[in-house]
Amino acid sequence: MEFSVKNKNLLIQNLVEIQQQSFNELLCVGLKRQLLQLNFIENKTRNIKLIFHAKNYKFILPEITPKEAVLKSKTFASALFIPVEYRAKNSIGLYWVLLGHLPFMTKRGHFIINGVPRVVLNQMVRSPGLYYKTTANPQNVSNQVSINDSSHTSPVFYSDIIPNRGTWLRLEIDRKKNIWIRMKRVDKIPMMLFLQALGYDLHCIEKLLYSRKFLNCDYLLNTDHPADSNSALKKIKVEIEQQKVLKLAALEALDDDDPDIAKQLDYIEKTTTPEMGKDFLFQSFFNPASYDLSPIGRFQLNKKLNLSIPSDYTVLTEFDIYFATKELIKRATTMSNSDDIDHLQTRRIRSCGELLEIQLGEGIERLQKTIIDKINNTNLKKFAKHSSTYKRGTSSSIYRQDRQVINTDKNSKFLKNNLPTKFNRITLEPNLLPNGTSFIHKNNKLNQVSSNKLKLLSKKLIYLNLLINQKFIIAKLKSANLLANKSSFDKFLIHLVDESPRQKFVKNKTGLYHKFIPTPEIYIVEPNLNLVDMKSQQKFNLLKMDLYKVGLAESFLKSNLNNLNIYLQMCLRKPNTYFRDISKICSAQITQQLKQKSFLKLLLINPRLISQNNLLVLNRAVNFLKKIQFNLKDSPNLNDYQNFEINKLKAHIFKCQIKTQNNLTCCKYIYIKTKFNYINLPIKQFFFTKRFLITEQKLLLGGKFINSNLALTSLLKLHKFSEVVSNSFLIYNANNPNPNPTSIMSMIRPVNKSEIYRQLNRRFVRSRLQLNVLKSELTNSHSQLIKANNDPIDRELSIQILKQDVQKSNPFNKKGIYNQRFINKKFLDTSQFIDQELLHFLKTHKIFLDRQLTSLKTKQQNEKLKFIKWKKLRNFKNALKNPIQNLITTNAINGALQELFGLNPLSQFMDQINPLSEITHKRRISSMGPGGVNRDNASMDVRSIHPTHYGRICPIETPEGHNAGLVNSPTIYARINNYGFLETPFFKVNSGQIQAKAFYLNAQKEQKFKVSPPDLSCSELQFLPLGPTKIESEVPMRKDFKFQRMAATQIEFIGISPLQMISVATSLIPFLEHDDANRALMGSNMQRQAVPLLIAERPVVGTGLEGRVIADSSYIMQTKQSGVISYVSNEQVIVQTFHLNN
């Protein structure tokens, strides 16, 4: 066989490119896609929020080389860090959190796990989508059976909706012409009942099902006495009414004074059939966390059903079920052919990168559950220093990228009330509310028994479809004091029925949608505010308001927000004129409410007493921000995050008055601009503001700001300005009278050991300086700044250091660590504040601390730095468990990855008998594994050769025995596209001339074109042969798997080489065309068992591809430039290159 290529410029790609490209796609795209699931987690009861900045993830390069990992029996992996923002009630922090260790692929295309090289095989699985199939009865000889024939000899038609992750759904028409829905571990469901549950009315269902025989509802009746559809539907309605009566009776039977009434109500609602059905439908098909079609599956469904649903909507819709049923009935009526499930277009390849991505997704789901459990069940006082008392048993919510909330509380109603269909017709969404409505409920305290009674009444009303929102019912009942007597409740109930919203159906062209249009009379505004008299200075309270999402006149605020902002600024500048001329921008009703309730009054804060020095700094910083606000001073030259925080703060702080009483300086009050969404501002919020302003003042004292480069990214977000000032501690040499501050700060991403040691000669600021040790050394140069004190640790004395003593180190600069001096002359800081900053530094640089402790200990012994207290450093190391470190552990992701490499059958020890065995092992494709085929039950159809395998899967190389046909190898030119489908190259043929450019076609596209084999002879100008007669000018070709002869001018594509149809191992067999197929199969397998020679020799008979296999296996040294080898020894190899310029 001649292995020549028609275009010599088309070279064979890297034989390990399948593995390398897949892992590269994981690092660039797949990892970010999985980390975006960690958007943020919030617990509103405990006022805790975790925000994951998934797009800014970082890797630390492995500390060891692959060779060292094998020798030391370690895993060649890289640490994955992600910035996480932690927000509590009174504290905020941004931390680099270690999520886990991702095993890295070597240049040779394999992994090293515990010192052992391992390979993750590619897996061939069924492509997600919709597939139609027919199972004929063996007794039925003729397939031409009418659809009206009700005999048992008719075939069974069914279609499978296969997702990438989730439950398989089968639509089936049995021999009795009944349509069913089938799922695993669930009894079959009638199609009509399933469509009604999805929100379709009988008119749509009758329009869908052409024949009346498809409307059989005999599943509710006795099969021996079938009835028509009308009687069956009547029985359905009767049973539903009976269930409604039984539920009302169960509610009436409950004792109103029973303290456990809430549990009983939840149990009754949980065991109700419609509620369970909502849970089942949502979790099975409409929840993105448990069901995923993938963009490929959505594309296949849209193509077969002629839909236009966006590709990013990867869950099922009611339209998919409706039109899939319609297409199934059409195929059953016309007796259409079923889909070919062995076609390569219905199979896709899961490469190692995708398998790793799936395991990472499972690990992230476990991590979310772990975080939520810790937030709900752990005492978080040790996480947040100033946190208030927390309650146990609260619920948390996960906010995904599409802003869909999945509440993790077991008794939550969210899963039932958020079906994307008409099935949740009791739920009212906020966007359907009428304009100008809002509800603000009174916050009256009731005893437990009264609350249970109100809850029972509200549930009765909800079930009777009288009201929509349970919170509104309770608020309405509380405001009316309905528990006093029964007559008042009856009057209220009659009044409420008259005011309740009626159901108004709005149908579109298809008649599939409906919604509720409520009346605005049922919503009331009853704020209960403890207003503060601005003139009395005895008591300072906060304005507290319960504003729901519907908010304070939402439509009014949207239209008049700018005018309100202008008016508020006028009020803030002149506090005495609160609501003068408000009628010009507000309606009369809103004006009256504002005058009575004072919605938009200023907040008055009573902060705690603070030290005089810090308050002076606070006052200076506020004055500076005021200058920036009124354009009296230019904005500071900080990075984007700092500018954002300054602009955010200057819009709220307008005035800060300072007063001294009893030798104590306190902040009397601060005017703060109100917000419309959340008006109340906690008192402890002031401490965060204080810390921000103190830190900002350090940079403002000199009138200039530090010009931080883009390299300082995540550590300086929002509040981390203090990281610029002090990230570590000063180390002074007791023997050196002129101390040189040395930075021991290193990069999070290490470069090499020599560079780390080179940075040890730079120093930084240390808190709690031992003044008795440093007094003699610092007296000469800092006598005017430091006072003598015998106390080794003076907490009250602020440490003052000159600007030449302070340097900044940047850990995120691409060029490495560099120093930058502060511009300001001096700065003030208390020892306690510097200690906090030291702890923040150690939290984010745990790896650095572990590496540098040994170096510092050696320096102490050599340079006699005896004043360093190792006990204190160890305490800092033990205190590294920050709020995020306690909530987020690496066990979830590391455990999921260990399952892939340790338990998954697709992860195998790398075959290292010879270079060919290694290359073949890395390119292998297996149909077995999780989600694949079981070799004990695999039929011959799965194992056999399909026409679409040409140029994509080798028909020769496959194992012998049970795995025959289930484990294959791709051909030498095949590649995997972005969607996981195999492609093979072809040359375009234009009017009988072969073009130079190659086109990669998948199996579905190739089936549409006229393709010729690659062994046709052609002229020097790449023209196909043209004979004198018509017969001689015809060439063989195939289209749609049919072979025939056709004129050369009608050919559209041609193969590139005879080598295109076989794999790498098969291409090394000489004279393959003269070999028997069975012997060629055994020969391709036995080549991988050959033991390599100690002294390499060229083969006596070869095909010319042996050198390429050796080169891509990385067993030999390769030069980057071509040339002539002039010298070889056991120490060096000299290659002489030739350049045209020389």
Swiss-Prot record:
Keywords linked to the UniProt accession: Chloroplast, DNA-directed RNA polymerase, Nucleotidyltransferase, Plastid, Transcription, Transferase
Protein name: DNA-directed RNA polymerase subunit beta N-terminal section
Location in or out of the cell: Plastid, Chloroplast
EC number: 2.7.7.6
Gene Ontology cellular-component terms listed: chloroplast; DNA-directed RNA polymerase complex; mitochondrion
Transferase as UniProt keyword: yes
Homology family: Belongs to the RNA polymerase beta chain family.
Disulfide bonds: none
Pfam families associated with the record: RNA_pol_Rpb2_2, RNA_pol_Rpb2_3
Reactions it catalyzes: RNA(n) + a ribonucleoside 5'-triphosphate = RNA(n+1) + diphosphate
Enzyme class: transferase
SUPFAM superfamilies, alphabetized: beta and beta-prime subunits of DNA dependent RNA-polymerase
Further information: In L.terrestris the gene for this protein is split in two.
Gene3D superfamilies per the UniProt record, alphabetical: 3.90.1100.10, RNA polymerase Rpb2, domain 2
GO process annotations (BP): DNA-templated transcription
Subunit structure: In plastids the minimal PEP RNA polymerase catalytic core is composed of four subunits: alpha, beta, beta', and beta''. When a (nuclear-encoded) sigma factor is associated with the core the holoenzyme is formed, which can initiate transcription.
GO MF assignments: DNA binding; DNA-directed RNA polymerase activity; ribonucleoside binding
Known role: DNA-dependent RNA polymerase catalyzes the transcription of DNA into RNA using the four ribonucleoside triphosphates as substrates.
